[in-house]
């Protein structure tokens, strides 16, 4: 409802309705299919400019989200992931899961929430695949549970050079580099909600991903734009994410990362 009111041109991924791009006031929110440059191109260009210069706010609720827990959760993820995930609580790690040929089966972010609890996040199309992969490939005897919590949390990406100012204004927290370094994850109070904020980006700008219990999603979304009005925040969609991640050289599972491409071939040796 909030997205439609803002002029969203909606698309879908794995049953999730989500904003591809936002039409400006007065323009019909529909895609114009043409052999020429489409009418939505300047709409996305404006979203990209705002994300680079002020703040873009993205609804990324369609992210696949699952908890990996249990006495052997660390050992299971250490076995499956290319990166070392035995990190301090509140640390997020970008990593992959590979097949026996060294090719990608999953492209994920793993955040340690507790000694034996991890939040694993991947693309919208990968939830069933990733959960199945972890369950099937976990070593025999490991006491590890995998629970899909995708529908329990909305995700808002607050991205851009003014994202720190916006979230500091809303939360009252210290979000400086010293207090909240890159790849740090911790809880923030946002209005009536307690959300998990992870400092990470898929668009190449300063930003945070906010994981919000769904019952508080509408209120937090409204609060973000109320605070964001003071810094020029705009709603932005998946066309903008795709354009900016390509410009930055970030990879995506199912596109650059597939089962016959290795981390070295993908230029992601640093994740191993």
Show where each model-derived region lies.
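Glycine/proline-enriched, intrinsically flexible loops and inter-domain linkers
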Residues: 1-272
């Amino acid at each position: 409802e909030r997205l439609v009111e803002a002029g969203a041109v909606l698309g879908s991924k794995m049953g999730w309705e989500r904003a591809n791009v936002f039409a400006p006031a007065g323009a019909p929110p529909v895609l114009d299919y043409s052999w020429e440059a489409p009418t939505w191109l300047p709409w996305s260009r404006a979203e990209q400019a705002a994300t680079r210069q002020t703040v873009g706010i993205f609804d990324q609720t369609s992210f696949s989200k699952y908890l990996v827990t249990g006495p052997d959760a660390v050992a299971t993820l250490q076995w499956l992931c290319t990166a070392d995930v035995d990190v301090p609580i509140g640390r997020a790690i970008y990593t992959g899961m590979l097949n026996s040929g060294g090719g990608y089966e999953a492209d994920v972010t793993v955040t340690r929430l507790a000694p034996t609890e991890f939040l694993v996040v991947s693309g919208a199309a990968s939830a069933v695949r990733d959960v199945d992969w972890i369950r099937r490939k976990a070593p025999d005897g490991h006491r590890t549970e995998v629970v899909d919590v995708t529908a329990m949390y909305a995700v808002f990406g607050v991205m851009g050079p003014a994202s720190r100012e916006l979230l500091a204004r809303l939360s009252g927290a210290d979000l400086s580099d010293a207090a909240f370094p890159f790849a740090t994850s911790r809880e923030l109070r946002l209005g009536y909600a307690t959300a998990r904020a992870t400092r990470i980006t898929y668009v190449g700008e300063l930003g945070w991903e906010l994981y919000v219990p769904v019952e508080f999603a509408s209120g937090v979304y409204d609060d973000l734009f109320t605070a964001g009005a003071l810094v020029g925040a705009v709603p932005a969609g998946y066309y903008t994410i795709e354009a900016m991640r390509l410009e930055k050289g970030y990879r995506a599972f199912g596109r650059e990362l597939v089962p016959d491409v290795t981390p070295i071939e993908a230029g992601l040796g640093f994740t191993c």
